[in-house]
Amino acid sequence: LEDGIYRLRAVTTHNPDPGVGGEYATVEGARRPVKAEPNTPPFFEQQIWQVTRNADGQYTIKYQGLNTPFEYGFSYDELEPNAPVIAGDPKEYILQLVPSTADVYIIRAPIQRIGVDVEEGGQQNTLTYKFFPVDGSGGDRPAWRFTREE
């Protein structure tokens, strides 16, 4: 994935292109959970993210909206099942391209847990960390369509 400004739409690995509409990663403020909201006012300006590849091949996802007093992005206080993704000090993530797509990625925390991958998904309009077997089983997984802003 190229560095740039993106909107991140919630999709799944089994349905990476669900059509019109959908929900997008939305910031509501520093140290608050990142939400999944429609790409409409009043949320539109809260859905702009700077995605940057770091030297180690991992990525940071930082809020790039208007009137940002300080830098924050995808982060966490704890990596437990269903813990929220928060808008905090940007952490690094692994972006794994979903096969047969050009712009859909699984966002994985680079945390070593025996036998599981820690991935970002959604639960009741809040982005949360989900745990899946590392062997690829476990069915449909949360994924994100990265739509570049010009």
From Swiss-Prot:
| Keywords annotated in UniProt | Protease inhibitor, Thiol protease inhibitor
Which InterPro entries has this protein been placed in?
Answer: Prot_inh_I48_clitocypin (IPR019508)
Technological use: Promising candidate for a biopesticide. Slows growth and reduces survival of Colorado potato beetle (Leptinotarsa decemlineata) larvae in a concentration dependent manner. Younger larvae are more susceptible to the action of clitocypin. Expressed at low levels by transgenic potato reduced larval weight gain and delayed development. The inhibition of digestive cysteine proteases, intestains, by clitocypin was shown to be the underlying mode of action.
Q: Which domain of life is it from?
A: Eukaryota
As one GO molecular function, the record gives:
cysteine-type endopeptidase inhibitor activity
Expression (tissue specificity): Uniformly expressed throughout the mature fruiting body (at mRNA and protein level).
Q: Which Gene3D superfamilies does the protein's record reference?
A: 2.80.10.50
Q: Name the family the entry cites.
A: Belongs to the protease inhibitor I48 family.
Q: What does this protein do?
A: Binds and inhibits cysteine proteinases. Inhibits most strongly papain and cathepsin L, more weakly bromelain and cathepsin B while it is completely ineffective against cathepsin H.
Partners and quaternary state?
Homodimer.
What's the protein here called? Clitocypin
Gene designation per UniProt: Cnc1
